[in-house]
């Protein structure tokens, strides 16, 4: 009987948490459940991951080259696909948990999406074995 009560309590807490997150999401168009991409994304195939990394590196290098020559070319940064970056970060985290990447590999991402501004900051440090 006690085990049944504990099980019902855990289920009830999960339902209440899900309902609260749903209500919050309905009030705010920009709300995302914490770890949204971790929970909802599949592992990326190697070819897709390499393509995303290559595009991201090319775009950021173009921007930094322009910035070093006195040009602020924000059109280059606008071409960065935030979804691809989120999927890459999720994939790196998933691999790191499984032990698939070097333990010294680090990554960090932070972003905000609001009606008046969008921001995405990320860093990935990869080390050879």
Curated annotation (Swiss-Prot):
Keywords: Host-virus interaction, Membrane, Signal, Viral attachment to host cell, Viral attachment to host entry receptor, Viral envelope protein, Virion, Virus entry into host cell. Transmembrane segments: none annotated. Disulfide bonds: none annotated. The keyword Lyase does not apply. One of its GO terms (biological process) is symbiont entry into host cell. Forms the envelope pentamer complex (PC) composed of gH, gL, UL128, UL130, and UL131A. The pentamer interacts with host NRP2. The interaction with gH is important for the formation of UL128, UL130, gH-gL complex. This is Protein UL131A. It comes from Human cytomegalovirus (strain Merlin). The gene is UL131A.
């Amino acid at each position: 009987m006690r085990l049944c009560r504990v099980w019902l309590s855990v289920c009830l807490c999960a339902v209440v948490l899900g309902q609260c997150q749903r209500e919050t999401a309905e009030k705010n168009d920009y709300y995302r459940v914490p770890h949204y991409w971790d929970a909802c994304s599949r592992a990326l195939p190697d070819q897709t991951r390499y393509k995303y990394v290559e595009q991201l590196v090319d775009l950021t290098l173009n921007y930094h080259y322009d910035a070093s020559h006195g040009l602020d070319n924000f059109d280059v940064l606008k071409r960065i696909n935030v979804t691809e970056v989120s999927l890459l970060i999720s994939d790196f985290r998933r691999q790191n948990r499984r032990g698939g990447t070097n333990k010294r590999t680090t990554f960090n991402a932070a972003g905000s999406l609001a009606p008046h501004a969008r921001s995405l900051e990320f860093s990935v440090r990869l080390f050879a074995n």
